[in-house]
Amino acid sequence: MATEHIENKLKLLPDKPGCYLMKDINGNVIYVGKSKNLKNRVRSYFKSKQVGRRAELVREIRDFDIITVSSDKESFLLEITLIKKYQPYYNVQLKQGTGYPYIEITNERDPQTRLTSFVHKDHGYYFGPYPNVYAAQATLKFIQKVWPLRRCSGHQGRPCLYYHMGQCLGACFKEVPKSAYDKQIRKIKRFLNGDISQVKQDLTEKMTQASMNLEFERAAEFRDQLKYIEQTVEKQKIISNDHTQRDIFNFYVDKSWISIQVFFLRQAKLLRRETRLFPLTDTNEPQDAFVSFIAQFYGQRNRVLPKEVLVPAGIDNEALAEVLGVAVRTPQRGQKRALLEMAHDNAKLKLDEKFRLLELGNRKTKGAQKEIFDALGLPYGHRIESFDHSHIQGADPVSALVVFTDGEPDKHEYRKYKLKGEVEHQNAADEVGNTREVVRRRYSRLLKEHKKMPDLILMDGGQIQVDACLDVLRNELNVNIPVAGMVKDDHHRTNHLIFGDPTQGEELKLIPLNPKSEGFYLMTRIQDEVHRFAITFHRRTHAKNALSSKLDEIKGIGPKSRNKLLRKFGSLKKIKEASIEELRDAGLTLPQAQTVKLSL
């Protein structure tokens, strides 16, 4: 529902192209969009029913601004600028950096080759990124052996170790001609761009010559270099007839999600690929999200632009090319078209996979919870609450509540209760008293605060706990929540549910669940979780009470001093280990600190 302020602004919208900026209650830009007609597009957010991520966006909008431009192309360019500036939450967001290394030929008087994770705009040469760090290291090592540049810090006044190994041109002790570097760099670039035939020929000739000169170690080194090329470079599948550095983008949309696939072609080979999945804010214009992704993709710190970008039809190639500064094309036939379709198929495959995994997850969560409700003959409910009690021969009795929503634990909703009733022995009457107290406290509070009740209560126990819970709900609170008990067998293993409502004249019945079903697994998981939560809380409570009792026995230590020690140290062991000075830092006087040390 649009506010009066927004309604008034909607009446003033022009029929022009431009960008709109949606803002939240704090004035922060949470979404940037563009349109050929601002009036129609912006009004659509508030004048029609929204679903999914777009509905979430609309709920947060408290204001908006517009910027008009003269053409759709200008609005696209402006949108990219605004997204970079504001990084809005509801626009496609990309993490910075790729984490993959590049091979760099540095832009220096005495250049060197090295691995780097950072791309600097210094006009150096960058090749990559390489998804396999070890392959990148091996390639760099090969280059440094075959076409050495500078490997030392330079200008040392004496030859470095690498010079003696033939892996440095000698900048360490002499001036190396620029032409010598240029010659090596041309060969390195040719190799990294996929032209390896000449390299293999040169290495074969050197290996043959070394063998003829009886330099067998050197011949073996050339042999290993040839082997590296054959195993690491040549084994990569050639998927293009030219060596143009090319990135291929395509996308697939389903169920308000977009899947984007990126292929990186280097040296006529598919170097690597990336997949990104995002929920769409504007499902009517997925192309906008796709183009925004590409622009942000190359705006990241460690991205090197290729020579060419391929995109599907329906994209404003001219505007995108202006943003990127490289050619953007849509092939109509041939090998490039096939690669573009391959990217689309892979994008679809990834999104289908995501939905299948979600479906499998739902079977284990929401589907499992439905099995429990079906077994009890109840309509599906989203929320299950479960109780368990814990005490040691009646000492420090506590109860714990866990909540499962659609088959998943909702730990923010867990609650712990210190029971106030006096318990002398662990028997049936104690369980009844504990159950009645915690159920009364829990649901009387929900009634008082007008909060939503659960759809099912599962008691960790049998008829005793179920009867006590139902008696409080029906006869004291007048609340109609289904209650079932999780019953264990003689081996303390969950066996079945017990369900019915004696307050309504229904007999409690045993309800079996298939031990191999997801519903049975969820029931045991709930039982284990509430038991764990209750036991953990009881141990802490018991330890704290035992510590308090021990401190109460020390003469001169009253409730205030005891609480100071509990807050500072938390355990009897730590208090014992504390020095006089540390005890005084906790707020005790010197005589009190000395008394504590002597008493413990």
Curated annotation (Swiss-Prot):
Any one GO molecular function term: DNA binding
Gene Ontology biological process terms from the UniProt entry: nucleotide-excision repair; SOS response
Keywords: Cytoplasm, DNA damage, DNA excision, DNA repair, Excision nuclease, SOS response
Subcellular location as annotated: Cytoplasm
Domain annotation GIY-YIG: ranges: 15-92
GO cellular component: cytoplasm; excinuclease repair complex
PROSITE patterns documented for this protein: GIY_YIG, UVR, UVRC
Protein name (record): UvrABC system protein C
Organism: Lactobacillus gasseri (strain ATCC 33323 / DSM 20243 / BCRC 14619 / CIP 102991 / JCM 1131 / KCTC 3163 / NCIMB 11718 / NCTC 13722 / AM63)
Function according to Swiss-Prot or TrEMBL: The UvrABC repair system catalyzes the recognition and processing of DNA lesions. UvrC both incises the 5' and 3' sides of the lesion. The N-terminal half is responsible for the 3' incision and the C-terminal half is responsible for the 5' incision.
Main localization (coarse): cytoplasm
Protein family membership: Belongs to the UvrC family.
Matches recorded under InterPro entries: GIY-YIG_endonuc, GIY-YIG_endonuc_sf, GIY-YIG_UvrC_Cho, RuvA_2-like, UVR_dom, UVR_dom_sf, UvrABC_protein_C, UvrC
Pfam name, any one: UVR
Entry-linked Gene3D superfamilies: 5' to 3' exonuclease, C-terminal subdomain (1.10.150.20), GIY-YIG endonuclease (3.40.1440.10), UVR domain (4.10.860.10), UvrC, RNAse H endonuclease domain (3.30.420.340)
Domain of life: Bacteria
Residue ranges of every copy of the UVR domain listed in the record: 197-232
Assembly notes: Interacts with UvrB in an incision complex.
